[in-house]
UniProtKB/Swiss-Prot annotation:
Lumenal side: 23-740
Annotated disulfide bonds: 535-658
Active site, per annotation: 516, 604, 636
Highest taxon listed in the record's lineage: Eukaryota
Enzyme Commission numbers on file: 3.4.14.-
Main location: membrane
Segments on the Cytoplasmic face: 1
Transmembrane segments: 2-22
Protein name: Dipeptidyl peptidase family member 6
Keywords noted in UniProt: Aminopeptidase, Cell membrane, Disulfide bond, Glycoprotein, Hydrolase, Membrane, Protease, Serine protease, Signal-anchor, Transmembrane, Transmembrane helix
Subcellular locations according to the entry: Cell membrane
Function per UniProt: Removes N-terminal dipeptides sequentially from polypeptides. Essential for control of distal tip cell migration.
Gene designation: dpf-6
PANTHER family the record matches: DIPEPTIDYL PEPTIDASE FAMILY MEMBER 6, SERINE PEPTIDASE S9 FAMILY MEMBER
Length: 740
């Protein structure tokens, strides 16, 4: 009874009106994205929508406020761009409506060239059905290395493009390798291919003069990385002499070590840094002398570890300038005198600061989404819980900013650590479980338009780095192998149970949503455990693991064994097909009893349109309600602003009908999107509910109950960064003591 007046007051507060953030503010292209500094620090480049809404490249003077548009594409938005060693010359990429067959162009962005012909560009690759990639660009040579799968769609040949003369020359004809690694002089030093057991085998050219083919007799084995170590093992770069290599190595370690060794003798490795709590994230290397400057780890929030004391004063100044944020260096000039810096924060969009080392001063240079400044955004809280098999799982919770919170004195003793973190609302919330894609990826801390939108509409958001995710060690990543639709799904269920047990979520008001693997998980949730979720939104998710494996893009064939390890079976034998079928939602579509929305891009090369078509057809055959949005000009996800705003308008209306959150008025077609909308009626809902009881009885045997109120393991420190002083870096000196 003591808490009753408080709860009544909180309920009154919760029903108070909030300012709805318009979808146009959240899902239009940001004013500034892909921000980078030119090598000479004179210009800052960025991608932004032009007056017609097409994403183009702009530049802004770094010492003044003058900005100008430098590309003038009228149909396809620019995906990305890079500076080159030639002043005023950039390369940029596009694709055809999301098909991921990337095209590459060179553009002279000087004022003189644009005045002469603003649309002029040099084609490097725009062949149909060819995926071109920028492989290596050292910002010193006039040459850039380009990869093109122009002969074999599964393999990329290597070409050298001269940014001065526009000459494109074949460097290596590839018949074998999926990955190449280059030194600072753009020489091919390593290549890799999958071994028979999914291990990664690195090769080096037999001759010091390099190789022009991939014939067996021209390459010798260099390193063999076992499959269990692949998730945290990778080459980073060469030192200035090209005689030593930096790697992150996973052998003998769950989180990995940053090491350096002579290229001629990889067994003579020296450990420079041992990861403490999370995998090593970014490795910051000096642009010219190639010495190690710093490393980052990201558990809940990024933490920075400094390796070079000449770098210390700069970083300490930047950390102190905004101690509540997590500092990140976005870009550096080639002489390292000028930096672009930003800070990760969940409750404000990214601001870009220009830092000049010679005067130790940073100034606000641009705000990526200034129109959001007037709104109150959510806070994102990192925490851990234990899954039913005792595996520690990291997750994030974002609550609506208007939701009143309970103090630690108002909750049971066991919940006080969570209340201290700001995780316990006065009343349980409507909740969206937002499942990341990959699945070899992770959710991160920081501003997200998706989180800002959902929490603004009155939903809490739960993001789970379930087993199979990356960033938390190879044990967690490898624990997902073969567990699609099983333990990876159980982790999501356990996270929901945790939220309900702590009073964070109302059990009857939990929805699930995600893209790619997250879309698959949504379909799994609504077919295998529909009683847990009120509704679901699947965005480009596969429904059939058999057809997913059959239809992988050709340029993924070099990683096929890794995919087979992930999904846990192959289609080459009947036992494998049965295993995949048993975890494919398509074959259990008649179990769906809750509202479902499916969103698909017609040009998706990863998850084909057939994945969604066949699931919708199965629902239609069983008279089960579904809303299907098909975008004929999109690929693996919805990118175009008019389509994105339309998509989120549909999702918002769908969630409001399911859970009752806030909405901004919406009419289909108001954004002039390309969406083709198909809705199947509700007459089959009763039939589907009858099928559910059988499904529940079958699936319940697979669901051993775990603890529903896991203990807290780690509270993020108040500090934004941890800075460690270290000796001047030398390529063979240990920088940090290895901690046991």
């Amino acid at each position: 009874m003591l808490f009753l007046p408080i709860l009544i007051l909180n309920l009154l507060i919760i029903t108070h009106a909030i300012d709805i953030i318009p979808r146009e503010v959240l899902f239009q292209d940001p004013k500034y994205s892909s921000v980078s500094l030119s090598p000479d620090a004179k210009q800052v480049g960025y991608v932004a929508p032009d007056e017609n809404g097409i994403r183009n490249v702009f530049t802004r003077c770094s010492s003044c406020s003058y900005s100008r548009q430098v590309t003038f594409e009228t149909e396809h938005p620019i995906l990305n761009y890079v500076w080159t060693a030639i002043p005023d010359v950039i390369l940029f990429t596009q694709d055809n409506h999301g098909d991921e067959n990337t095209r590459i162009y060179k553009k002279n962005i000087s004022a003189t060239a644009i005045a002469a012909d603003k649309t002029q560009r040099v084609v490097i690759s725009e062949k149909p059905m060819v995926k071109a990639m920028i492989l290596s660009n050292n910002l010193i040579s006039e040459t850039v290395l380009i990869g093109m799968n122009d002969e074999n769609p599964a393999l990329h040949n290597i070409y050298a493009f001269n940014c001065q003369t526009d000459e494109l020359k074949l460097v290596l004809q590839n018949r074998r390798f999926s990955i190449f690694f280059f030194d600072n002089d753009l020489n091919v030093r390593l290549a890799s291919e999958e071994g028979p057991d999914g291990e990664m085998i690195y090769y080096r050219p037999r001759s010091n003069e390099g190789a022009r083919t991939t014939e067996q007799n021209t390459w010798v084995e260099y390193l063999r990385i076992q499959h269990d170590d692949k998730a945290i093992t990778m080459p980073i770069t060469f030192d200035k002499s090209n005689n030593f290599m930096y790697w992150i190595m996973g052998d003998g370690s769950d989180l990995g070590n940053l090491v350096v060794f002579p290229f001629e003798d990889p067994q003579q490795k020296e450990i420079l840094y041992t990861a403490q709590r999370a995998q090593i994230g970014n490795v910051l290397i000096h642009p010219t002398d190639k010495t190690l400057l710093a490393v980052t780890e990201v558990y809940h929030k990024p933490e920075l570890f400094v390796a070079n004391e000449t770098f210390m004063e700069d970083l300490q100044y930047l950390v102190n300038m905004k101690p509540s944020g997590s500092m990140n260096i976005v870009s550096m000039s080639i002489d390292m005198s000028t930096w672009l810096v930003t800070y990760s924060s969940s409750d404000e969009p990214y601001d870009i600061y220009l830092y000049r080392r010679w005067n130790k001063k940073a100034e606000l240079f641009m705000s990526t989404r200034p129109e959001l400044k007037k709104y109150t955004l959510n806070k994102q809280i990192g925490f851990d819980f234990r899954a039913r098999d005792e595996m520690t799982i990291q997750a994030y919770l974002s609550l609506p900013p208007q939701a009143p919170l309970l103090k630690s004195s108002q909750v049971p003793d066991g919940d006080r650590p969570y209340a201290n973190l700001g995780m316990i609302p006065a009343v349980p919330q409507k909740m969206i479980v937002l499942v990341h894609g990959g699945p070899k990826a992770r959710d991160h801390y920081g501003f997200s338009p998706m989180n800002a939108w959902l929490t603004n509409r009155g939903y809490s958001v739960l993001q789970v780095n379930f087993r199979g995710s990356t960033g938390f060690g190879k044990r967690l990543t490898n624990a997902g192998n073969g567990e699609w639709g099983r333990k990876m799904h159980f982790d999501i269920l356990d996270a929901v149970e945790f939220a309900v047990s702590k009073g964070i979520a109302n059990r009857s008001e939990v929805a699930v949503m995600g893209g790619s693997y997250g879309g698959y998980e949504t379909l799994v949730a609504l077919t295998f455990t529909p009683q847990t979720f009120a509704c679901g939104v699947d965005i480009v998710g596969p429904s059939n693991l058999i057809s997913l494996v059959q239809a992988i893009p050709p340029y993924w064939l070099g990683f096929r064994k890794d995919l087979i390890k992930m999904v846990g079976a192959d289609i080459s034998d009947e036992e494998g097909r049965q295993s995949l079928q048993s975890r494919s939602p398509l074959f259990f579509a008649d179990r769906v009893t809750k509202p479902i929305m499916i969103i698909q891009g017609a040009n998706d090369p990863r998850v084909k349109q057939a994945e969604s078509d066949q699931f919708v057809a199965a629902l239609e055959k069983k008279h089960i309600p579904v809303t299907y949005l098909l975008y004929p000009d999109e690929g693996h996800g919805v990118r175009k602003p008019q389509n994105s705003m339309e998509q989120h308008g549909h999702i918002e209306t769908f969630l409001q009908q399911c859970l009752g959150g806030e909405t901004q008025p919406f009419q289909p077609g108001q954004y002039n999107s390309s969406a083709i909308i198909k809705k199947i009626g509700i007459e089959g809902a009763a039939i589907a509910r009858q099928n559910l009881q059988i499904a529940q009885n079958q699936f319940a045997q697979q669901l051993p109950r775990g603890p529903v109120a896991p203990s807290i393991f780690y509270r993020p420190p108040v500090r934004a960064q941890r800075v460690m002083l270290a000796p001047n870096q030398n390529v063979m000196n240990r920088i940090f003591p290895v901690q046991g």
